């Protein structure tokens, strides 16, 4: 595929890759997309409620284009800007909404309220962004903008836009829940102690812990997914939410010798699902110690798509931690060996080491979400997971076993379909 490059500096108001006629409401998953789900509801503070329409006329995808930029180059700036954005959102909410969106920092709910399964399969924490007013929706997306780098916010926005395109254009019976996203805060938003921002739905599950005292940010664990991975808006703009990841993955693969590629592709791709306690087994494959300096940098560039989603300083700090144990990290790959989304069924890989776990898997099916002329499986339907065996949730809680369908199905497939079990 041809990579679309944005050569313009970001304008004061965000311009995301979706047409002005595009609308969004919210949510999808990592290995288990499921058709034929039914909506559920529960209490305002602990359960998921699905929405068929937003409180206003603006959808989540539209709100993502309405935020204003708040550039950060240091960890401290990101924490401060995100804290200000959280406070601004809370100021727009009612007392009941504020109670629903906030949790104690050490509440174990944070470990089971994100998933690669739809919002009707796994309860999300906090508020359904689709239920908010236009002002509140924009304020919620402003939190995400303040937290993320330009590239990461663009990728997240295009994941959201792709979900809405799927809802509007596909044969999915789940159109009413596609595009539904939730936002929650664990701990008090402040730049002097730790708190977590949780934002996600089906193909997005961001867990960012910001600690002003330690001057640190971690995105472990986080789920990024996309369906479809390549589509065109009504005004002719091509949207490829995962092009950066695909490009980095194949830059690494193509840097390897034939012998290294053979070791890589003969290895065991391991998978660890959201909501899974995970043993983080490394499996077999190519060792980090067998890479050249250039290859190591390319691998770290690939990992940074998950681990380095905030400012340059925090991204560099996490990169250094991962690099310190890269010799003991195992990489495995299966599937296609050429970046051509018109051929084959996509790629799968895992990167597993003492300080990093990344699982990437192309989904073998569309989960009933088919669009004429658009690939919605394989290359076009991907679930990924990023975790840190030493620092998930900044060690604020221990991962709890998922309820519902959060554990066994991701990212290899829904339970019972023969996919990896996530352990």
Can you describe what each PLM-predicted range is?
Residues 30-58:
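Bacterial lipoprotein signal-peptidase II cleavage site
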Residues 53-95, 99-130, 138-149, 154-423:
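A cross-kingdom marker for long, charged
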Residues 2-37:
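Secretory targeting and sorting signals
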């Amino acid at each position: 595929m041809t990579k679309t490059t944005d050569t313009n500096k970001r304008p004061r108001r965000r311009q995301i890759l979706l047409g002005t006629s595009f609308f969004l409401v919210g949510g999808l998953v990592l290995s288990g997309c499921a058709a034929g789900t039914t909506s559920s509801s529960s209490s305002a503070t602990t359960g998921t409620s699905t929405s068929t329409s937003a409180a206003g006329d603006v959808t989540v995808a539209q709100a993502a284009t309405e935020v204003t930029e708040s550039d950060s180059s240091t960890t401290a700036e990101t924490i401060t800007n995100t804290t200000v954005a959280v406070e601004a959102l809370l100021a727009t909410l009612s007392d009941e909404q504020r109670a629903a969106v906030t949790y104690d920092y050490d509440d174990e709910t944070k470990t089971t309220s994100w998933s690669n399964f739809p919002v009707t399969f796994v309860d999300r924490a906090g508020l359904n962004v689709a239920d908010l007013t236009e002002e509140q929706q924009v304020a919620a997306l402003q939190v995400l903008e303040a937290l993320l780098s330009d590239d990461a916010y663009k990728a997240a926005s295009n994941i959201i836009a792709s979900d809405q395109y799927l809802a509007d254009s596909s044969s999915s019976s789940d159109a009413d829940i596609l595009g539904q996203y939730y936002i929650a805060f664990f701990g008090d938003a402040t730049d002097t102690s730790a708190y977590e921002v949780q934002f996600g739905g089906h193909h997005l599950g961001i867990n960012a812990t910001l600690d002003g005292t330690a001057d640190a940010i971690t995105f472990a664990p986080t789920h990024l997914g996309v369906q479809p991975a390549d589509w065109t808006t009504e005004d002719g703009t091509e949207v490829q939410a995962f092009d950066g990841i695909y490009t980095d993955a194949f830059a690494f693969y193509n840097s390897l010798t034939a012998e290294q590629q053979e070791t890589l592709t003969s290895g065991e791709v391991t998978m660890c699902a959201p909501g899974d306690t995970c043993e983080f087994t490394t499996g077999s494959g190519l060792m980090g110690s067998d890479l050249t300096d250039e290859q190591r940098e390319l691998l770290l560039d690939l990992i940074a798509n998950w681990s380095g989603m905030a400012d340059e300083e925090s991204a560099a700090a996490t990169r250094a931690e991962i690099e310190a144990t890269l010799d003991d990290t195992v990489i495995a790959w299966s599937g296609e060996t050429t970046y051509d989304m018109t051929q084959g069924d996509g790629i799968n890989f895992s990167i597993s080491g003492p300080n990093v776990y990344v699982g990437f898997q192309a989904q073998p099916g569309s989960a009933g979400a088919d669009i004429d002329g658009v690939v919605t499986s394989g290359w076009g339907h991907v679930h990924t997971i990023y975790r840190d065996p030493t620092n998930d949730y900044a060690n604020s809680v221990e991962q709890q076993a998922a309820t519902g369908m959060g554990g066994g199905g991701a990212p290899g497939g829904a339970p019972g379909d023969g996919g990896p079990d996530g352990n």
